[in-house]
Amino acid sequence: MTMTLAFDVYGTLVDPMGMSRLLAEDAGDRAEAVAALWREKQLEFSFRKGLMKVYEDFGVCTRQALRYAMATHKLTLSEERENALMAAYLSLPAFEDALPALKSLRGEYPLFAFSNGGYPALEKVLGHNDLLDQFEGLVSVDDIKSFKPDPAVYTYARRATGSWEKPLCLVSSNAWDVIGARAAGLLAIWVQRDPNKVFEDWGIQPSAVINSLSELQETLKNL
């Protein structure tokens, strides 16, 4: 099937939990817990801002979530250290399967990065991991001032990728993103990076499930 691929970035191509190593300096043995809460609240804050129609850049959500996670664990950061962690977020590590998968698909499918992140952040984190040049373009929610899983965001992605006449397939490790895309009429493949994670039972199923991006090329042949 001829289609365009839209890759989620955070959690799919790059690993937000990569911040736990840096947080060890501030949180000690609680670093992983802080990093997990940081990510959880980053998403929650973006969802809430989208529903409330009070859009702010994803970086603002990220900073607010960091402050919440630290405060919850009764930890403090200096302004300088907070800024350093925010800067480090722009160089999150890529998953090992990301670059090989994109290279194998490039030329066979139009590839786009599709994210709640803003363009400057996407360019930095993808460029840091040598992923940026694999894409035909970037699609950011910043263009329409809302966040996934708002249906308008997925509709916009169709327009931005030129996918009105052919299918657009989201590739994401975030179940909420996959459900949002499917509800909006897109194909969507769930990357189940953690075998212990279950897909939420909303009566909406992913188009396919893979455990690694290395399985993507073969899976696409069967959609």
Regions found by a protein language model. Give the residues of each.
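Active-site neighborhood of HAD-like aspartate-dependent phosphohydrolases
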Residues: 1-43
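Alpha-helical elements of Rossmann-like donor-binding domains used by nucleotide-donor carbohydrate transfer enzymes
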Residues: 21-22, 37, 64-68, 84, ...
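Short helix-capping segments at alpha-helix termini
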Residues: 27-31, 72-77, 130-134, 162-163
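Residues at secondary-structure transition points
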Residues: 29, 33, 53-57, 96, ...
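Short, acidic loop-to-helix structural element flanking the phosphoryl-transfer center
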Residues: 59-60, 77-113, 119-123, 151
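A metal-dependent, Asp-based hydrolase signature
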Residues: 32, 46-83
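Asp-based, Mg2+/Mn2+-dependent phosphohydrolase catalytic module
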Residues: 1-2, 103, 114, 118-223
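Hydrophobic side chains within well-formed alpha-helices
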Residues: 19, 34-35, 81, 131-134
